[in-house]
Amino acid sequence: MANIDIEGILKQQQPYDGRVPKTKIVCTLGPASRSVEMTEKLLRAGMNVARFNFSHGTHDYHQETLNNLKTAMHNTGILCAVMLDTKGPEIRTGFLKDGKPIQLKEGQEVTITTDYDIKGDPEMISMSYKKLPVHLKPGNTILCSDGTITLTVLSCDPDAGTVRCRCENTATLGERKNVNLPGVVVDLPTLTEKDKEDILGWGVPNKIDMIALSFVRKGSDLVNVRKVLGPHAKNIQLMSKVENQEGVLNFDEILRETDAFMVARGDLGMEIPVEKIFLAQKMMIYKCNLVGKPVVTATQMLESMIKSPRPTRAEATDVANAVLDGTDCVMLSGESAAGAYPELAVKIMARICIEAESSLDYGAIFKEMIRSTPLPMSPLESLASSAVRTANKAKAKLIVVLTRGGSTAKLVAKYRPAVPILSVVVPVLSTDSFDWTCSDETPARHSLIYRGLIPILGEGSAKATDAESTEVILEAALKSATERALCKPGDAVVALHRIGAASVIKICIVK
């Protein structure tokens, strides 16, 4: 950490000065935020990615929300990526007699049956996982209803399809509550039939940008999902959510196969000891940073803002520490989907991110990234790291990357420059003018989960030489950057682009 002083800490909050955090913000859209008016407010407040949670809602409901988002993007001119978060495989308790909650008392014994037709009572409850008596053994723990009920396994009878347990605490159990089996390897598919229907029936037709996959347990899960996507796989990023011990154990192979990663601390926090969650978060973020894959930190980041206009001090510190750990994105769930202050939550999250980013020692981060990158570097990685080194040495205010698919700009982002990266998605040029629109926004929207990357869409052309057309695009990019207050006349800007077969890094002075 750097740039920390007493005066800076004590300085009163300043009015909004136009600064935008490098860290991206993912917002879950729901009843509190799905209107065109509120979605516009979230976009202006700093939302970069809209999350559609398919654990809730119908296709028609989500379609209406997406249509509202598209209208809001058109009205504001702000680009936003679309994330489909799958419900994933789950184990739930069954229905209860008369639909009434039951009281479980500490020390009492209860039988669990895999016959889901049985209506539960204090002596017997059902669970939806058929192989429960096969995979559990005496001494295992079963957590129900978000961990509020702990059951210890006493015996298993696979033939009868039952498990005998002891209740470790007094609590009330309602119908269809979630179940976690810490440390138990379960035999459930990563994609359920519902997930496939959501992805192929809603996600693919709507050209979504990314899928957040719940309960990824091994690298082959991602290979199978890409097979399901078929030809659409190349346009949809896969974001893995590791939410159990098996996934943590296989983290490295999952990281090799995934496009992005989400540290989903909710279910993970019930699978591993609560005092180890911070270690898992730091390990996952660090490993994602080393390979240049974007990582989202999620769950309960500003949870109290569902009801309160101010976060708790612990929540504010949690968001800042995720930024210091190296996260690319921070995420709001209930805060933006169903909270009383969705816009304020985004604004506060953005302010916290800006403060945390200003305290980072970017020189030390760059050295660590260089030290940890295997040699020899690929030509593209060598160029990307050199562009960041040049920007650091020249005290540049901005890095501009002209790219067709976005991969060069993403590699620049891996080296965490202290300045923003303007990623200009360059089309094939064919006319005499340059216009800031693009028929295919996919590469630009994919950039919206990388820290520090600001994508700009370009469509246009020049019948001139490659070198001349590049200069036209670069000049337009610098003009756009000036309008966005990313730089001003007299500032040094590092540009990275290709001319023919050669790659060029140069320092430009903004006119």
Swiss-Prot record:
Keywords on record: ATP-binding, Cytoplasm, Glycolysis, Kinase, Magnesium, Metal-binding, Nucleotide-binding, Potassium, Pyruvate, Transferase
**Main location as per UniProt:** cytoplasm
The feature of type site (Transition state stabilizer) is located at K241
GO cellular component, alphabetical, reads: cytoplasm
**Enzyme Commission no:** 2.7.1.40
- Domain of life according to the entry: Eukaryota
Q: Where does substrate bind?
A: R51, G266, D267, T299
- Cofactor annotation: Mg(2+); K(+)
- Please report the name of this protein according to its UniProt entry: Pyruvate kinase, cytosolic isozyme
Q: Which organism is it from?
A: Glycine max (Soybean)
Lineage, highest ranks first: Eukaryota, Viridiplantae, Streptophyta, Embryophyta, Tracheophyta
